[in-house]
Amino acid sequence: MHGHSRNGQAHVPRRKRRNRFVKKNGQCNVYFANLSNKSQRYMADIFTTCVDTRWRYMLMIFSAAFLVSWLFFGLLFWCIAFFHGDLEPSPSGPTAGGPGGNGGGAAPTAAKPCIMHVNGFLGAFLFSVETQTTIGYGFRCVTEECPLAVIAVVVQSIVGCVIDSFMIGTIMAKMPRPKKRAQTLLFSHHAVISVRDGKLCLMWRVGNLRKSHIVEAHVRAQLIKPYMTQEGEYLPLDQRDLNVGYDIGLDRIFLVSPIIIVHEIDEDSPLYGMGKEELESEDFEIVVILEGMVEATAMTTQARSSYLASEILWGHRFEPVVFEEKSHYKVDYSRFHKTYEVAGTPCCSARELQESKITVLPAPPPPPSAFCYENELALMSQEEEEMEEEAAAAAAVAAGLGLEAGSKEETGIIRMLEFGSHLDLERMQAATLPLDNISYRRESAI
């Protein structure tokens, strides 16, 4: 049911908010379901499974592995001692042939145990812990009476070394992982679209909160939106690249201070036909990725974020955050996410803006100051030659009419021509052309 506003206009219901494919903190909002043999596949790659798992789960797994191995071999040692008869109480008291008896026979000798000083399961468990951890208290030990007990000690020592090596290797592989390094790489809360150098551009800001650098840092961006092919196939997550300067190397950045990443909306951009109104009604997501190597460990790290269509501000720019001080540059991160509105930003799409420039705006005429000085001198010389030709023709006409060569009139005409040529020469010498900035820019451009 459509509602109505107070002024009588129909109220258009808001589009359902799109589920993020990548969350703002960089986590991918994807759930895997109905995987066949998932446990077997994860156990086949147990090392990667342990490295990817959380610390608390990993410590619980290794603690359980140690405890199970201690209990298993403790039970094994207890069984060996039990079946050998080491757990039975030794006979005590005087014998028939001993002192106070009538007989003169010797006392019976007690059998040698397999494991010394193991009188129950608790003692066997302690002996198992001492063997696997190589504590070596020296109170309990295995004798040569039972070869099975010796074999059990050897096997437990090997198993203990394997568990220790696996745990240490997993911890050493997990500790230097640059996963948490992405927490100190910052993306702006919003992206903006405004005019830069006469073209509409999509921009967002990235920053590094640590003083340690990200080596070989480079950025990528992809637009994800539903797409219907010509054959009617529906693609819910169609991915299109956004060019951020791959061809000329602008995608590689020196991330010491916050930098604004620019995507120029041109003919190859998926946003080329999208204006302000289309942006408000579109359903898409822009995933931005920052990759590089951690300076301390030389391991590759990746930071991700995303912007929905509702998080892109049309006609805005980012406030400056880098300020020059007397001896250094100051970065004010309190302004990192702030933007300001730019008046005069066109609301049309980049395609319409380009077409309006081609069809409506005429080419500006060249300014008079664009003429070079040599062309001006050539024009003046041509005028002077024409005046001399006219003077020669007048002299020829006067000679044809019978005028004397030395007459005063001819002398006056010649002096007049010389005076005119002298004035032209002074005008040429005093001629200066005012060259403005536009002419200089054009000459440098040529």
UniProtKB/Swiss-Prot annotation:
Q: Which Gene3D superfamilies match?
A: 1.10.287.70, G protein-activated inward rectifier potassium channel 1 (2.60.40.1400)
Q: How is this protein named in the record?
A: Inward rectifier potassium channel 4
Q: Which GO terms describe its molecular function?
A: inward rectifier potassium channel activity; PDZ domain binding
The family line of this record is:
Belongs to the inward rectifier-type potassium channel (TC 1.A.2.1) family. KCNJ4 subfamily.
What gene is behind this protein? Kcnj4
Listed InterPro entries = Ig_E-set, IRK_C, K_chnl_inward-rec_Kir, K_chnl_inward-rec_Kir2.3, K_chnl_inward-rec_Kir_cyto, Kir_TM
Intramembrane bits: 121-132, 133-139
Which keywords describe this protein according to UniProt? Answer: Cell membrane, Cytoplasmic vesicle, Ion channel, Ion transport, Membrane, Postsynaptic cell membrane, Potassium, Potassium transport, Synapse, Transmembrane, Transmembrane helix, Transport, Voltage-gated channel
Q: What is its subcellular localisation? A: Cell membrane; Cytoplasmic vesicle membrane; Postsynaptic cell membrane
Enumerate the residue ranges of region (Val/Gly/Ala/Pro stretch): 91-111
Q: Where is this protein chiefly located? A: membrane
Mind telling me which Pfam families this protein's record contains? IRK, IRK_C
User: Which superkingdom does the taxonomy of this entry point to?
Assistant: Eukaryota
Provide the transmembrane region boundaries. 56-80, 149-170
Q: In which tissues is it expressed?
A: Detected in kidney distal convoluted tubules (at protein level). Widely expressed throughout the brain. Also found in some peripheral tissues.
Q: Which residues lie on this side of the membrane: Cytoplasmic?
A: 1-55, 171-446
Positions of the record's site feature: Role in the control of polyamine-mediated channel gating and in the blocking by intracellular magnesium: 164
